[in-house]
Every structure is written in C-alpha cells, then in structure tokens.
UniProtKB/Swiss-Prot annotation:
Originating organism: Feline panleukopenia virus (strain 193) (FPV)
Role: Capsid protein self-assembles to form an icosahedral capsid with a T=1 symmetry, about 22 nm in diameter, and consisting of 60 copies of two size variants of the capsid proteins, VP1 and VP2, which differ by the presence of an N-terminal extension in the minor protein VP1. The capsid encapsulates the genomic ssDNA. Capsid proteins are responsible for the attachment to host cell receptors. This attachment induces virion internalization predominantly through clathrin-dependent endocytosis.
Residues that bind Mg(2+): N323
Compartments, record wording: Virion; Host nucleus
Comment, domains: The N-terminus of VP1 is sequestered within the mature capsid. It contains a phospholipase A2-like region and nuclear localization signals that might be exposed by capsid modifications during virus entry.
A family per Pfam: Parvo_coat
Main location (coarse class): virion
Name recorded for this polypeptide: Capsid protein VP1
Upper classification of the organism: Viruses, Monodnaviria, Shotokuvirae, Cossaviricota, Quintoviricetes
Amino acid sequence: MAPPAKRARRGLVPPGYKYLGPGNSLDQGEPTNPSDAAAKEHDEAYAAYLRSGKNPYLYFSPADQRFIDQTKDAKDWGGKIGHYFFRAKKAIAPVLTDTPDHPSTSRPTKPTKRSKPPPHIFINLAKKKKAGAGQVKRDNLAPMSDGAVQPDGGQPAVRNERATGSGNGSGGGGGGGSGGVGISTGTFNNQTEFKFLENGWVEITANSSRLVHLNMPESENYKRVVVNNMDKTAVKGNMALDDIHVQIVTPWSLVDANAWGVWFNPGDWQLIVNTMSELHLVSFEQEIFNVVLKTVSESATQPPTKVYNNDLTASLMVALDSNNTMPFTPAAMRSETLGFYPWKPTIPTPWRYYFQWDRTLIPSHTGTSGTPTNVYHGTDPDDVQFYTIENSVPVHLLRTGDEFATGTFFFDCKPCRLTHTWQTNRALGLPPFLNSLPQSEGATNFGDIGVQQDKRRGVTQMGNTDYITEATIMRPAEVGYSAPYYSFEASTQGPFKTPIAAGRGGAQTDENQAADGDPRYAFGRQHGQKTTTTGETPERFTYIAHQDTGRYPEGDWIQNINFNLPVTNDNVLLPTDPIGGKTGINYTNIFNTYGPLTALNNVPPVYPNGQIWDKEFDTDLKPRLHVNAPFVCQNNCPGQLFVKVAPNLTNEYDPDASANMSRIVTYSDFWWKGKLVFKAKLRASHTWNPIQQMSINVDNQFNYVPNNIGAMKIVYEKSQLAPRKLY
C-alpha cells in the first residue's frame, strides 16, 4: 500500500487564509485574497532572509514595510490584524535593510557604480538631501517594483531625491540608484514574463516602457468649446453626420496605457491565444522617471536659429486620480493611447471631457417635406459639472531627474475567455434518437429519424400541435439574441448608434441583414498603421468575432396563433416582409429578443487596438457587459494619470494685461514604464482532433518586420480561435 501523501504544514493560519500566520509552508496553493497574497510574499522574503543567515523575526525589514503598505486598505479582518501587528513591530524593532546579503522578494538587481556628480554643481542639492534624508529613507522602503499598493484615495509616491552615498542603489525596477541630474533613475523594460504555476495556472507579467514627449499646453486656461456642425445635418437625410457637442478642453494631458498593443508584441499575443483558455486581470502599476525639461529660444537672425537648453528649475506637474473623481475618458476609443512601438517616442493625448448640453434633432430622409428640425438648446443650469484637476486631485511637481510612482492597483474583474463557442440553440441537449444508421460510406443525406413527427416523445412549447421536431423542441435558454444592427436611438443630446454585442451570425456580405456588430477600428502610425504612410487617412480593420451569438436574421420568422402547417401568408411574418412598404426594411431590422433567458458571451479582446478594462457605470441597474472592453472593474478602476508642463513665466507676465500668459517655451521628455499582471489558465485539449490556431502565412509574415527604410505595421490578431462547448 502506498504511503499517504504528505499534507502541507499550515501552522497558525486562521480560517479563510493559507499564508497569513506563522509556521505555514509556502506550497499551500493560490492565496485566498489580496491580504493572503501579501502574506505569501512576506513569507517568501522571510525564507530568503533565513537562507542568507539573517533572522528577520528580530528586525523590522523592508518585507515588513511592504506588507504594511499592501494591507493599508484591507477590508478583511486578517489583513487588518496583520497590518497593525507589523506597525507595532516597526515601532520597537531595529531596522534590517535589503543588501546583497539581505535579499528582498523583488527581482534581483545588481547595484551599479555611477560617477559622482561634481561637488561644485550639486552642493546645494547635497544640503537639501541631508535635510530630508529621514523622509527619503522612509520613501525608499516601498519602491514601485516591490509592490506598494495604490489605495483608493491614497497618495502616490514621489521620489525626487534619494540618498546618494557612493551611488549604489537597491531595489528592483526604478526604485534604486541616486536621483539628480545626469544620473539614471530607472530601467527600460518591455519584456513579457511567463511564470508557470501549479494546477495549470500561468502568471503573465507584461512590462512596458516608453519615451514620452510633452509640449507645454497651448493655453493655461480651461475652455468650454461648443462644436456645432448644424450645416451638415441641415441637409435632409444626413442625421448620422451629427457632431454637435460641448467639451471642456483642459491644459492637461492623459497618459493612457489601456490598450493591448501597449503591453504585448505580436509574438506574445500569439503565444497567449494559442496556449491559454482564459485571462484574469490582476494588478497594474506605472511610473514616471528620468524627467527632462528644456526651454526653446529663437535667435533674431535670418534665418532664425532655435536653441535648446536644459532647465533645472522648470517643473513637470503630475496628478493621479486614484479616487476616480474626474470624468473617465479611456483613450482607446479615439486611438490616442500611448504608442505600440517601444523604440519610438510617443505623446500623451490632450485631456478633455464632455459637458452637458441639450439639443433637438428630428430624423429625416431625402423625401422629408420641410426643413429638418435641428435646434441647439444649450446647457441646463441644473446639470453643470465643471471639473478641474488642480482643486480635485493632489498635484506633484517634478524637476529634472525626478521620478513618480503610482503604487499597485488590484483589479476586481470577471475573467476573459480566449475561446469561442459555436453551439446555438439547435445544438443544445440530447439529439433525437435514430432508429437506423447509415450502412454505406459517404452517405450525407440521411433524411428520416425514423419516428413520425407527431408521435415522438419530448417537450415543446407549441400549444395546439403534437409535432416535435428540431425546430419545435424546447431548449433550456436562448443562446444570444436578435438585435437590430443599424439602429440609432436619441437622447436629449442627440442620436447615437445603439451598441450591441459583436459575434458571428448572418451573411457577411449583407450587413443590413447580418446584424453582426463587429467593431471597426481606425488608427494612425503610432498604433499599427504602416509607419511610412503619408496623409491624414487612417488605416482600418474590422474585427470579425468568432463567437457565435446565436442569431441569424435571414432565418427568423414569427408564427401566428394558432399554429398551422403549412403556414399561409396570413399566419407568418418573414424577414422578407417589408415594414411600411419600404424595400429592404424588414421586421428583423427592429426585432430584439433580449430577455431573462438570454445566454451571452463576453466581448473578445481585440489585439492590438482594443481597450483592456473599463469603468463600471454608477447606476442602480448596471449592464452585464461593456462592448468596448472585456474587463469591467466592479468597484474602482485604476486612476487616470495626468501630466502637464508647469507655467514657466517671463518677467513680462501681467495678470491684468491679457488672458494669455507670457511664458518661456518649455517642453518635457520623460520615461514612462508600467507593469500589468495577468493570471491565465492553460488550455487543456479534450478533443481528438487538432484545432486551428493563430498563425501567419508567407504573405503577411513581412508585415511584422521592417523593410529597408524602416516601414512596418501591426496586423490585428484573432484572440478566440479555439472552440469550446457551452452546454
């Protein structure tokens, strides 16, 4: 008889946890919640200290500080108790630092010697560092890459001047080394790391870095701009050209990394979709470092010459909206996220948001009598909401060489599938029993089940007939639903295209009948368009989803009561029956079958241009899905990151003279990096047959590599090629 399997040592771990407590082993499986995950990381750090010959139980270590930071906003009782326990330890125990002999749990980073700046240049900087050394030491206990937590409403970390000493740094990522002019403060990393865990799970850490260029804003003022193109919609039948809206244009810019192409290269995505079955969004963090600020002056000579100078006193303003106070404005919907090429500099998008307005546009067509009704009413005083970053979000001032870290945000989202379903209602449950089977090879027209249709057993919802067929038998629910494709609704602010869940269904050649709702993306050279393309016309693609929504409008019909066979013209409504006698307008164009029995898959991730996560609506009845992103944050979402070159004034500035400030032309280049962590489930093969996977052919292989002048493009990739059963 085989000996019993050894059970992992649990130690003094309270119920509901696997690692929160002393004496447990490190092989208990996946943590149960964020506090338990912090405890596991803490235990791993303690194990590393013990292996190096140090006793962390007698000292307060950086691992203890990281646990305090990660449980600062813990909602569970265990996390709260652990948080205050280590705060008490911090008050009484001597400090143990991370050195080469005292390891931490972050990725190992070898300290590098850097040249010490000339003392005659930085003597004032050294005095300032000495005065603030205590605070700097506390800041360095929780660098970004060591897992600092971004709490709801908490303060991000600004590490602008750290202890220099001999120039040796500690900690992973951008947390080590000395700050200041001429000294690097971070690393440039665009690797995707796959860590294979137990039970078929994979931890995917996507690192991304970009050089970001930011000009000073055209104006330091907030502006309310009314866009009014009533000349276009004054023409009959042109309602869809309506662009009327009001927006607040701000002097800030938005650093938005919420697109798949920011994080994964085409090879990464191929590996993920070919080997994984689902993705879980875990955490997100980002950092700004190596800030450079320069002024631009122009000579009076002809032709004029521009001179660029470093400005060590100019400031870069940074604000993290961790409480989501500002309007949520994901940039992927406008293709204005950070660029997808790590080696190319990118720009943040100017930040703006919608402002309330009312208007009336009555639909028309070319045969409508009279002039189209198109009235702009303006803003309702009851609905005015004017937001400014300066009085709503803490703003941090960075100078040359400074850095800023957001800490870690943990997501609360449902997983995203990387497989598609093909089963519709006609493929659910037990097929009918066949009285006889084919006797010859290749027979494809086996026409009769063998039992007369009005004598079969089973369940239907047909009230006055005994026929049981594949068309009439009762199924458990409705897979997908019929929805109108080109349907525009109207609000008090104008018409809008009704969003629908995209999916396969209907003839691709006739979109008016197909009602697929596949998203169509338009983008420029930063986001996949061929890099040598000239002109303003963007490149486009339509993402044709593999999911079968269950709808096929060409085959719909409505049967009259009472049921009759065969049906006559008076007993049935077909897709070919027009509405109002208009050619091509059929009842299926307005037919919606969504209801409580509807089964529907989530939207697919669209690589590279699609949005990754979205913010949940602040409504009492919330949508089950969002069509623009597969991950919907259940409570909070990562705070938006805003940047702005601070006003660099001249001596001619007079606040009473003009609305425009007299400013020195200033711009900033800074390095941005982020880390986005997923957990994925390896896809198991349960079928005999091999399946189609994401691949390329000879014709499109060279889209992914540059030509002799550097021209290249990014071609979108499918994300749900592998099939799965849904019932």
